[in-house]
């Protein structure tokens, strides 16, 4: 059993939490968000323990890995803390909006030899999976070229835009 702490409970964080719950090899031990009411609400939905400071998860020796799905501006700070406690890390994209900060983070964490993955693919996107299934079944024909336009089904809120990972800046 791999014990996980989920940090950040926005749209993508909740999606990761639900996906983790579906896998019998993972236990979502903690959930955290800067919004305490949201933390409590989502902890009930995901049958997890609410925490109100990420350091609780970092210091817990039972936690094997952290999923960082908080706002982009918090990613590096959380990663730097997680590596000190030898946690495996999954971090949503982007790591940061500033290449110098990213390079500095890389230098700082290398001495810890961390297990870290950035969520930068659409491998499990339902639309992509459906396309693959249809191709395998031969319903589409011979594949020659794919051009993809990727977007959410609805525009994001103004509140989200203020802390988004830079796609709208």
What is the meaning of each model-derived region?
Residues 26-30, 64-66, 166:
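Short active-site oxyanion
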Residues 1-45:
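N-terminal Rossmann-like dinucleotide-binding module
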Residues 23-24, 60-61, 125:
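Acidic-histidine catalytic/liganding microenvironments
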Residues 104-121, 142-147:
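Rossmann-fold dehydrogenase core element
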Residues 122-169:
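Predominantly a Rossmann-like dinucleotide-binding segment in NAD(P)-dependent oxidoreductases
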Residues 16, 48-108:
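Beta-loop-alpha module in the N-terminal Rossmann-like domain of NAD(P)-dependent dehydrogenases
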């Amino acid at each position: 059993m791999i014990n996980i702490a989920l940090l950040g409970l926005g749209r993508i964080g909740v999606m990761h939490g639900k996906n983790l719950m579906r896998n019998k090899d993972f236990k979502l031990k903690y959930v955290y968000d800067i919004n305490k009411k949201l933390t409590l609400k989502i902890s009930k939905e995901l049958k997890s323990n609410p925490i109100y400071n990420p350091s609780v998860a970092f210091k817990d020796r039972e936690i094997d890995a952290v999923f960082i799905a908080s706002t982009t501006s918090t990613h590096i700070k959380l990663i730097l803390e997680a590596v000190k406690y030898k946690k495996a890390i999954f971090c949503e994209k982007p790591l940061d909006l500033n290449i110098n900060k990213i390079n500095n983070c890389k230098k700082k964490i290398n001495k810890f030899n961390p297990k870290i993955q950035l969520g930068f693919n659409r491998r499990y996107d339902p639309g992509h999976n459906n396309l693959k299934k249809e191709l395998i079944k031969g319903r589409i024909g011979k594949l020659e070229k794919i051009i993809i336009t990727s977007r959410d089904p609805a525009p994001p809120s103004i509140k989200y835009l203020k802390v988004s990972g830079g796609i709208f800046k």
